[in-house]
């Protein structure tokens, strides 16, 4: 448990440091919207995406992991969101499903505008996970549960009308799970480019009351 706590703490610090809401406005010539600028503060955002990663071993065993996250968030200011999300994923090895997973939890996402139509986004997820995996001792599926910590960058393209396309091109995550038969196991993902890729779409929803001056 001592080593588990150290790992969780280290990954959390790394993720928050990398994706902190205090991202410098000078980075890549980007800027964060000021509090008095017209922005999405107080709006809600809903999103859906499809994530994909592939690993081929020297024995030509192909492992494909796909997931479909869905989430809703709230703009606490013009640049940062907090929210909840859910994702289902499965792992296929040589066309056989060996792993099914559900995960749900909270997320935090800071952003920096890169001009008028592009956004650099970071996201940190903290999730409870549960599902089934193929047992190493017997050819049967067994239940598991645990948690996942994840940090990743995205590039967003503003489409107008509150819509945006988002592309995930890297990921750093830790998954810790346990079963009755095997106890705790730990796995990591640290990929970039085609090894871990995702594409999604989001929509901002504005329920704020508009003053007469806004009309």
Question: What residue ranges belong to the model's regions?
Answer:
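Outer-membrane beta-barrel translocator domains and adjoining extracellular loop/strand segments
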Residues: 56-64, 93-100, 132-142, 177-185, ...
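Gram-negative (and chloroplast) outer-membrane scaffold detector with strong preference
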Residues: 68-149, 157-163, 202-205
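Predominantly the C-terminal beta-signal and adjacent terminal strand-loop region
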Residues: 34, 151-215
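General detector of folded, globular domains
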Residues: 33-44, 54, 75-77, 90, ...
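Generic short beta-strand segments
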Residues: 50-54, 86-90, 127-128, 170-173
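Structural motif marking the loop-to-transmembrane transition
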Residues: 4-5, 64, 147
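Short glycine/proline- and aromatic-enriched beta-strand/turn motifs that initiate or cap beta-hairpins
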Residues: 24-76, 80-85, 196-211, 215
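Bacterial Sec-dependent N-terminal signal peptides
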Residues: 1-30
């Amino acid at each position: 448990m001592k080593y588990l706590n150290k790992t969780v703490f280290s990954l959390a610090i790394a993720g928050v440091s990398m994706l902190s809401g205090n991202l410098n406005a000078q980075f890549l010539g980007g800027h964060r919207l000021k509090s008095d600028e017209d922005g999405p503060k107080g709006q809600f955002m809903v999103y859906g995406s499809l994530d994909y990663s592939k690993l081929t071993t020297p024995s030509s065993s192909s492992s494909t992991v796909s997931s479909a996250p869905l989430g809703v968030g709230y703009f606490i200011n013009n640049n940062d969101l907090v929210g909840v999300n859910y994702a289902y994923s499965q792992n296929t090895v040589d066309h056989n499903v060996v792993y099914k997973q559900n995960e749900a939890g909270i997320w935090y996402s800071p952003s920096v505008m890169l001009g008028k139509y592009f956004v650099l986004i970071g996201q940190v997820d903290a999730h409870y996970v549960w599902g089934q995996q193929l047992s190493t001792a017997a050819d049967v599926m067994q239940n598991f549960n645990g948690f996942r910590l994840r940090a990743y960058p995205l590039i967003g393209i503003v489409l107008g009308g509150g819509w945006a396309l988002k592309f995930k091109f890297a990921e750093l995550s830790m998954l810790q799970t346990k079963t009755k038969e095997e106890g705790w196991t730990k796995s990591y993902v640290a990929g970039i480019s085609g090894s871990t890729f995702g594409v999604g779409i989001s929509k901002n929803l504005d329920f704020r009351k508009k003053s007469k001056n806004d009309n």
